[in-house]
Amino acid sequence: MHEPSCTFTGHRAEKLPWGFDENDARCRRLKQKIYDTVDAVYDAGFHKFLCGMAEGCDLYFCEAVLLLKEANPDVVLEAAVPFAGQAARWPERERQRYEALLRRCDTVTVLQEEYSAGCMMKRNRYMVDHADILIACYDGKPGGTLNTMRYAIKQDIQILHLPLEDA
């Protein structure tokens, strides 16, 4: 029996209007929107979640799913890591956060050993190919998030769009 699953796409921290400042009110509101959406998706029968584990919105999503899992132990979280050592060049604090979150995931799928051009899109396609619904934090600009949404549309995957606040 197929277990309905949900994945996520969103911008990296450096592309967010508030950057790495997670105390910014816009960031706090987005994190709440992500949690509320994850909770609603869970209530609709989606208990498996896939996360790409990139800096920024992906980690917000991961944290929201793990928070949901505290109250709902049937939640399953898979980390879809594009390449081994994804966080090796991140700032120490973000790398520690990443590693702590990775340890709490039920499954970690590493798609390839080393970085290569296109490995992020390969990861994004893997997630869409294994999901029935996509939550997207998107600001309207070109990039990996838009490409992932376009791929999801081609695959006939439902998209729940969470717009980003500019200012």
Task: Report the location of each language-model feature.
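Acidic/glycine-enriched connector segments
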Residues: 1-166
